[in-house]
A protein has these predicted regions:
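Cysteine-based protein phosphatase catalytic domain of the PTP/DSP
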Residues: 8-94, 115-150
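Short intrinsically disordered terminal tails
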Residues: 1, 160-165
């Protein structure tokens, strides 16, 4: 696991990627980011508490922190956060989900939200990977295969539940 500094390095460029209309994933917010310029109603911050930087939140906008460690295992709250994001999008809100690099934690939460909204796991994974693209270092979104396997198992589990009498 890479250790990143508490604040972004000088010249840090925050990046946002539209996965579908009303759902964006992104990298760590740059210090001093003006929430109003992001074009979103809700920011869902998945960074560890020690890394989080909270922007000034204008009236009518929402900032939510669901800290998730940058580890190889899927955080237990991922499913609940994804359902919440899907409900926000369903109510017409535009949501930005971000972690440090906008790859794995943001990717698994966004993909699971897409599944809640009716996409297959394979489609959700492909869409997140395609829309996020590679980092400058060549890392893909959802490069953590444990996260991909979890998403596929979530679909298999929900399919089994639908078929149960």
């Amino acid at each position: 696991m890479r250790q990143l500094p508490m604040t972004p390095p000088p010249g840090w460029r925050m990046e946002l990627f539209e996965v579908i209309p009303h759902l964006l994933i992104g990298t760590r917010l740059a210090s001093g980011t003006d929430y109003a310029t992001l074009g979103v109603d809700v920011i869902v911050d998945l960074e560890d508490w020690e890394w989080a930087w909270v922007p000034t939140v204008p009236i009518g906008k929402v900032y939510l922190s669901f800290p998730m460690a940058d580890e190889d295992e899927v955080d237990p709250k991922t499913r609940d956060v994804a359902h919440f994001i899907a409900s926000l999008i369903g109510s017409g809100r535009t949501v930005l989900v971000h972690c440090t690099e906008g790859l794995n934690r943001s990717g698994v939460v966004a993909a699971r939200a897409l599944m809640v909204m009716g996409r297959t796991a394979t489609d959700a994974i492909s869409l997140v990977r395609h829309r996020r693209g590679l980092t400058m270092d060549g890392f893909p979104a959802l490069g953590n295969e444990a996260f991909v396997e979890w998403l596929l198992s979530e679909e298999a589990g929900s399919d089994a539940n639908r078929r149960a009498p």
